[in-house]
Amino acid sequence: MSTERAIFAGGCFWCMVEPFEERPGILAVTSGYTGGHIEYPTYDQVLSKASGHTEAVEILFDNELISYDELLDIYWSLIDPTDADGQIYDRGANYRPVIFVESEEQRIAAQKSKIALEKSGIWDKPIVVPIEEAKTFWPAEEYHQQYYKKDPKRYQAMHKARERYLALQRFKGKFKFLRKNTR
């Protein structure tokens, strides 16, 4: 077994855990904060937008069972990559989408994946997700961990609203792509 780490930010971390955690080869998914200047940040500090941190998930995975490229594919399916100022209803820099890379190999894979998404025509606006060097990851408070199990009804409502929003955004992008290419 060869363990690797990935860190992705994509809005509220509550909606980022289950889609990764259910995959074979995933060893752990932790909700937390990264990218800021305060050590041991709390949820309230991150929410205040004064810490510089972004909500994110840290994923430990067995790269013999699931690849970093597969994780990138899952990540892109969970976010609106054209929105740099948060995701869906969660607005501000603390909810911005970011791919935090651990190595040059991850950076190259993330860049290739981003370019492929841009060329796909799925989205009608530029892909604006930055690729940044990973910094210290601070686990969030326990009540945030595996939220989908702790409050399944609320999680399902949030998850379904997010899926509907993303489906609509993708449809709008495909419709514009089709109209542009049939003229």
UniProtKB/Swiss-Prot annotation:
Pfam families: PMSR. Gene3D superfamilies: Peptide methionine sulphoxide reductase MsrA (3.30.1060.10). The active site is at residue 12. It is an enzyme of class 1 (oxidoreductase). SUPFAM superfamilies: Peptide methionine sulfoxide reductase (SSF55068). Its EC number is 1.8.4.11. Has an important function as a repair enzyme for proteins that have been inactivated by oxidation. Catalyzes the reversible oxidation-reduction of methionine sulfoxide in proteins to methionine. It catalyses: L-methionyl-[protein] + [thioredoxin]-disulfide + H2O = L-methionyl-(S)-S-oxide-[protein] + [thioredoxin]-dithiol; [thioredoxin]-disulfide + L-methionine + H2O = L-methionine (S)-S-oxide + [thioredoxin]-dithiol. Belongs to the MsrA Met sulfoxide reductase family. It comes from the Bacteria. The keyword Oxidoreductase applies. GO terms for molecular function: L-methionine:thioredoxin-disulfide S-oxidoreductase activity; peptide-methionine (S)-S-oxide reductase activity. InterPro entries: Met_Sox_Rdtase_MsrA_dom, Met_Sox_Rdtase_MsrA_sf. One of its GO terms (biological process) is protein modification process. This is Peptide methionine sulfoxide reductase MsrA 1. Keywords: Oxidoreductase. The keyword Ligase does not apply.
